A protein has these predicted regions:
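N-terminal glycine-rich FAD/FM-binding segment characteristic of electron-transfer flavoproteins
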Residues: 1-263
Length: 263
């Protein structure tokens, strides 16, 4: 069994973020990290692989040079190998372009043996569109089971459990399939020192768009089918108003709401 888990290197959510002139998030000059929910995706892939016995887990990422750090983190957690799609022409890809490149990479990985399961996180913290998993499945022509909190594989099928607002839902699909994992799925393992050192010896393949047979004008800013029309930083949070209750706190609160047109 072969499992591909897609991971993304994103700006640290605790760090200050700036927008470029094109309205996109500036990614240079700041600390980055593995997308948080992708840790849950890697954990889910590893659990499936361990239960299957002898399964191979391949981490897949795309992006600039430092994007490989996300793949290396997956290797430290237990993935067997990694692929980094590195090509300047892919910069600025929208969700559909990203899915197009990742699908081409999955197909190339499958040249060495069928890929049974593709696992992703439910969303990336730098965009939160949640579009890539479904778009990737569509590109590959396979079923997508989204927002999974539990993933198991048996008898040539994947079974996932989803937590909905008022009920749990269990879905089953024949392999190959794609599963996007919820941030409530599991608690990702923390690699120990031995795992971190062992990851240094694991192979990381670097592929260009040419290696994947993807024309540059189909992806990146040039091939994007969506455009950012406007973007601006979120306004700074205003200072809190403290009300001392001397018997008229309710009246003070009501006056504040009326003054700020909140009531």
């Amino acid at each position: 069994m072969r499992i591909v888990v897609a991971v993304k290197h994103v700006p640290d959510i605790q760090a200050d973020r700036t927008l470029g002139q094109d309205g996109r998030l500036a990614r240079d000059g700041g600390d980055g990290t593995l997308n948080e929910v992708d840790e849950n995706a890697v954990e889910a892939a590893l659990v499936v692989a361990e239960s299957a016995g002898g399964a191979e887990v391949i981490a897949l990422t795309m992006g600039p040079d430092d994007a490989v750090d996300a793949a290396r983190r997956a290797l430290q957690m237990g993935a067997d190998s990694a692929v980094h799609v590195l090509d300047e022409a892919a910069a600025g890809s929208d969700a559909l372009g990203t899915a197009h490149v990742l699908a081409a990479a999955v197909r190339k990985i499958a040249e060495d043996g069928p890929v049974d399961l593709v696992v992703t996180g439910m969303a990336a913290t730098d965009g939160l569109t949640s579009l890539v998993p479904a778009a990737l499945a569509a590109e590959l022509g396979i079923v997508a089971l989204t927002l999974a909190v539990d993933v198991t594989v048996a008898d040539g099928a994947v079974v996932v459990r989803r937590e909905l607002d008022h009920a749990d839902e269990t879905l089953r699909a024949a392999l190959p399939a794609l599963v996007s994992v919820s941030d409530r799925a599991n608690e990702a393992r923390y690699p120990n020192f031995a795992a971190i050192m062992a990851a240094r010896k694991k192979p990381v393949a670097v592929w260009s768009l040419a290696d994947l047979g993807v024309p540059p004008d189909e992806v990146g800013s040039a091939g994007a089918r969506t455009r950012i029309l406007a973007a601006e930083p979120r306004p700074a949070r205003k200072d809190r108003v403290l009300v001392t209750d001397t018997g008229d706190a309710g009246a003070q609160l009501a006056a504040y709401l009326v003054e700020h047109k909140l009531a």
